[in-house]
C-alpha cells in the first residue's frame, strides 16, 4: 500500500545530510547507506549511493527514472543461480 501524499516520502535524515554536503562539490564521493527503505527524491539525482544488501554495499548511480522508488529496489539481496538442468539419463526415460 502506498504512503499518503500528505505525509511525504520517507528519507533517512543522515542520508539527506550527506547529500546536502556533496550537493555543490565537483567530485562527488560514493555515499554508503544501510537505509534501503529511503525513497529516492529529485535531490538524489546525479549522486552515487552504495546500498547495503546484507553482505556488501552495491553502488547505484541515481537517475531521473529512479525518482519515487526505494533505494532497496536497486540492490538485490538474493542471488539466483538458475534451476538444475536435467540429466541426459532422465530425458531418455
Curated annotation (Swiss-Prot):
GO terms for cellular component: cytoplasm; small ribosomal subunit. One of its GO terms (molecular function) is structural constituent of ribosome. GO terms for biological process: ribosomal small subunit assembly; translation. It holds the Pfam family Ribosomal_S19. Coiled coil: none annotated. PROSITE patterns: RIBOSOMAL_S19 (PS00323). Disulfide bonds: none annotated. Residues 80-93 have a biased composition (Basic residues). Residues 72-93 are annotated as: Disordered. This is Small ribosomal subunit protein uS19. It comes from Aster yellows witches'-broom phytoplasma (strain AYWB). The gene is rpsS.
